[in-house]
Amino acid sequence: MSSRQGGKMKPLKQKKKQQQDLDPEDIAFKEKQKADAAAKKALMANMKSGKPLVGGGIKKSGKK
């Protein structure tokens, strides 16, 4: 038998995250990941709106 019966249980406390010392390489890697995520988000938005993924496509010449 537990001392708590019914009601809402309190959430467990989590330890505070320690601040890590980041190298310049780590900072550059995180910025690259952010840029890739932003580019992917923009690409997905273009796909949803129906825009073509590539600009070229098949070019038809006027000559026969």
UniProtKB/Swiss-Prot annotation:
Residues 1-38, 45-64 are annotated as: Disordered. One of its GO terms (biological process) is cytoplasmic translation. Its main location: cytoplasm. GO terms for cellular component: cytoplasm; nucleus. Pfam families: TMA7. Involved in protein synthesis. Present with 3100 molecules/cell in log phase SD medium. Belongs to the TMA7 family. Interacts with the 40S ribosomal subunit. This is Translation machinery-associated protein 7.
